[in-house]
């Protein structure tokens, strides 16, 4: 990608009114003889995504460290997210509350070492090729930054206490009783900044809320932008939402008001770890070109340091879900949206969605997940060395990495805009 191309793709977007005017004025000279196609509202909305705004939102989230659930830094991050959503014009914010019980602390399991062969991965996947060890860092001293050690020092309290998700809703003009849910999880672990897992997904959802909340933007159907808590403890925030809200779908309240506190779910779209697709782990070499060995004499494996040229956005559904057929159609609709509107990276569709906040929804509504790699087959095989580690820092990622996240945002924005009948009024 040339510097000129990068600049063109990441330059600050123009206001909606200017874009609409330019779209309409361009063909005026031919207006008397040639029919004028109306401007494409989806293209206009996708054009409002901006790399620097996306990066700035991720950076803002990192001020709260790893945002571990149950801590003051997690609650402060929720407050910050809600304030941002309101500042965008998505002012009808709400909190969904639930109780979570933190078990007594136990000695963490050792990271899984890679094994030969092709064993089963999570979500029905199969593991192939070289694999690096994975695990969750629980050692404060593994974080060399004293400031981050202090910021992340408060542990989750044991016992049962209150947790919250936060969300806001773009209310549809024609069908407010129906909605698509667009989500990401805002909590993290590992003693880092949780910049990628899942600051990258949280920032994506917030950017979509910003754009859909702009004056003049209308959708026929509603869109709910949700930031889940307690993903890292077992998808508890998303599960609480499903448990509390699934039986309220499509109910008008009060009767005759035209208001639907929980519109009927048409689809759930999750975003988790959006930026790092450097490829399969490879043997690391010393200065003499010899393989590096660990303390057990095994080769040290790690993914390449640069984003690979063939990086893509992975769109997953779960083949065993009750709504698998609808989820597959939704996934392929998003793939088509990527083909038409994304700027740098393509998308691929897989059917092993697992271990993410769309999973509690998948037997209630078509549900898909967008991410940097397949969750079971690739992330679970050590393709991301920063996963749950103290190195999940804003500074660990390049613009090529951030751009992959932005392309996922382009994909979801375009797909949701098409499905909800988005319009941009002059």
Residue ranges and their predicted role:
Residues 166-168, 182-236, 412:
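Alpha-helical metal-binding/catalytic segments enriched in His/Glu/Asp
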Residues 33-72, 88, 96, 101-108, ...:
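N-terminal capping segment at the start of a domain
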Residues 15-27:
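Bacterial N-terminal signal peptides
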Residues 40-49, 62-73, 152-157, 187-199, ...:
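Second-shell loop/turn segments in exported
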Residues 2-18:
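Bacterial N-terminal signal peptides that target proteins for export
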Residues 228-357, 363-367, 374:
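Metal-dependent peptidase/peptidase-like ectodomains
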Residues 376-426:
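His/Asp/Glu-rich mid-to-C-terminal helical/loop segments that flank catalytic regions of hydrolases
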Residues 60-169:
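A non-catalytic alpha/beta surface segment that caps or lines the substrate-entry region
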